[in-house]
Amino acid sequence: AGQDGFMRF
């Protein structure tokens, strides 16, 4: 989560 800026919550 948040490794590629996709799951940036």
Curated annotation (Swiss-Prot):
Domain of life according to the entry: Eukaryota
Residues bearing PTM Phenylalanine amide: 9
This protein's record includes keyword Amino-acid biosynthesis: no
GO cellular component, as recorded: extracellular region
Predominant localisation class: secreted
Keywords: Amidation, Neuropeptide, Secreted
Gene Ontology annotations of biological process type: neuropeptide signaling pathway
Localization in the cell: Secreted
Family: Belongs to the FARP (FMRFamide related peptide) family.
Name the record gives this protein: CalliFMRFamide-13
Organism from which the protein derives: Calliphora vomitoria (Blue bottle fly)
